[in-house]
Amino acid sequence: MTTASQPPLIMGIESSCDETGVAFVRGCELLADEVASSVDEHARFGGVVPEVASRAHLEAMTPTVRRAAERAGVRLSDVDAIAVTVGPGLAGALLVGLSAAKAYALALDKPLYGVNHLVGHVAVDQLEHGPLPKPVVALLVSGGHTSLLLVRDLATDVQLLGETVDDAAGEAYDKVARLLNLPYPGGPPIDRAARDGDGTAIHFPRGKWGDGTYDFSFSGLKTAVARWVEDAERQGRPVSVPDVAAAFQEAVADVLTRKAVDACREHGVRHLVISGGVAANSRLRALAEERCAAAGIEVRVPRPRLCTDNGAMIAALGAEVVAAGLPPSPLDMAVDTSLPVSSVLVN
């Protein structure tokens, strides 16, 4: 039970894609974070299948809640508020999480907060490094999203600076991995292969670089890699998977970090948060640290487990909106597959 001297106990539920995540948070303290992933079920299809994801969430939700509560050493009746992802994401997957959260809120008579998945990726950094400075620029890089945000206040003031106009960075990783006969999801195997490669051996294009915006494009890069591999095979030249992986990874990290640093400079921001599944990439982390150090910018990257989808990010954002005194969401709220980042809380 929460005492007057303690921050409220928040349960967070995440189900926007292929991870069922449940976590318990007090303020910036993570008590438990349990994730059930269906990635292996999607691997044979080479990508996430919405129907498979929804069924996996249905099977995993209750056991994941139980494991998280046990690990946190709390009872569900101890919870002060429940936070749940309402978007963006896959409609069926989101609906499973929202339905579960509504059921718990009604059964326990607790307030429910429907929050934004993307802003959760920023909020989770507080569980790793403490309260966020205000303002920060956030670079979110995942399989479904690549966005630059200006965050003046996590609960009330998040602005979209730019986003991908076609493929997300993580999606490009998956497609390039398939070209190189590497397993799904593509991020980790490309990162491993690139360690033995030369990132300067091949020059791949940097989409939308120097266009005066903070938008991204990775479709042209993916096509350029495909053409390079096809040309090499047609001409009988050996395809060095490590070199292709390293050069591709260099192109992605180059554009992401340059635009992120430029956004910090333009808005007078001295702190950059990088999160999302692709934030676990070693070259992206190294180049971000190098360029931010040169620009006098502090870069904050959560540990890899917190970068991927999880309940901790949703509980962390829930803790923020509760602390801000914002009213709960209505119990008749619906999922929103294209929820804009400016909508931190559904109310």
Curated annotation (Swiss-Prot):
Transmembrane regions: none
Biological process, per Gene Ontology: tRNA threonylcarbamoyladenosine modification
Gene Ontology molecular function, alphabetical: iron ion binding; N(6)-L-threonylcarbamoyladenine synthase activity
Species name: Thermobifida fusca (strain YX)
Protein known as: tRNA N6-adenosine threonylcarbamoyltransferase
Record localization: Cytoplasm
UniProt-annotated binding residues for substrate: 140-144, 174, 187, 191, 281
Function summary: Required for the formation of a threonylcarbamoyl group on adenosine at position 37 (t(6)A37) in tRNAs that read codons beginning with adenine. Is involved in the transfer of the threonylcarbamoyl moiety of threonylcarbamoyl-AMP (TC-AMP) to the N6 group of A37, together with TsaE and TsaB. TsaD likely plays a direct catalytic role in this reaction.
EC number(s) stated in the UniProt entry for this protein: 2.3.1.234
